[in-house]
């Protein structure tokens, strides 16, 4: 048997985006069985392009079964380190496809759920509610990250405006880790990781940032409003979403501590370039959400 070993480091969103790369890789060499090694194997469950999925660090007998004396190709490149990504020349999917030697099939990311799995998630989210669901994700990063990153998180001042506008007519579920603040009027979405990935399917309104939620929504064909600050939708986003940018203009030259990127994604306060905290136009976001 011929194998392609696809090693995917990084977070949930990067893994969801990588499903588009694996789809292209499978089309380029359909006889090869693709094996995924990832910190987030839940993203890859039920994926028809994937032969087996391994949790990173839990790879007993992997070398013996798939590498030693086997016909295998190993793809362990990190597209974040490629100059076409760093210099904002190509979308990350295109950069990654170039690295693995596959043509982008333009299908975009995909997530796969069985009907019974979706029914179970729907019951957890919807049962007992009398209002449609508004799904809100304003803070990115992992479970051990900082509570707030100005580089990609929606400012609390904007988020409160939006919640206050919609809270009487919608049941607002907020996606976030324990350290991240829960806005008054919102309900914490307490589901397992894979269940949260399916949550866009059961929502009427969706407001996201540059985090895994907007990748999941795209993978499920759920048009969403996405707010961008540091990163660019041309590189990490999708045309199908409504992409919104700050109306505040940078006022300070904060590149004194920057290396290959303009700022650290963790949101170092010394790199904040604006002269006000409320950098988005809340009314613009509300109007775009009304259109959904």
Regions found by a protein language model. Give the residues of each.
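Catalytic machinery of carbohydrate-active enzymes
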Residues: 1-292
């Amino acid at each position: 048997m011929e194998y392609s070993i696809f090693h995917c480091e990084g977070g949930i969103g990067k893994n969801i985006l990588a499903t588009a790369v694996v789809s292209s890789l499978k089309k380029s060499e359909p006889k090869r069985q693709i094996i995924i090694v990832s910190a987030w194997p839940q993203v890859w469950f039920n994926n028809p392009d994937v032969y087996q999925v391994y949790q990173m660090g839990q790879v007993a007998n992997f070398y013996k079964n798939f590498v030693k004396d086997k016909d295998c190709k190993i793809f362990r490149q990190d597209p974040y380190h490629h100059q076409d990504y760093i210099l904002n020349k190509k979308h990350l999917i295109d950069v990654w496809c170039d690295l693995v030697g596959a043509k982008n099939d333009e299908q975009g990311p995909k997530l796969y759920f069985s009907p019974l799995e979706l029914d179970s998630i729907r019951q957890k989210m919807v049962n007992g509610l009398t209002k449609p669901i508004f799904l809100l994700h304003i803070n990115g990063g992992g479970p051990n990250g900082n509570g707030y990153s100005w580089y990609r998180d929606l400012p609390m001042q904007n988020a409160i405006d939006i919640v206050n506008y919609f809270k009487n007519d919608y049941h607002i579920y907020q996606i976030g880790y324990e350290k991240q603040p829960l806005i008054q009027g919102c309900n914490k979405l307490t589901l397992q990781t894979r269940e949260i990935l399916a949550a866009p399917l059961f929502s009427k309104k969706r407001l996201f940032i540059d985090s895994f939620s907007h990748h999941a929504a795209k993978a499920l064909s759920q048009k969403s409003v996405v707010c961008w600050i540091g990163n660019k939708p041309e590189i990490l986003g999708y045309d199908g979403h409504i992409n919104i940018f700050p109306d505040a203009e940078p006022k300070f030259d904060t590149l004194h501590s920057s290396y290959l990127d303009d700022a650290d994604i963790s949101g170092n306060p010394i790199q904040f370039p604006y002269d006000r905290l409320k950098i988005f136009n809340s009314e613009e976001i509300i109007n775009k959400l009304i259109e959904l």
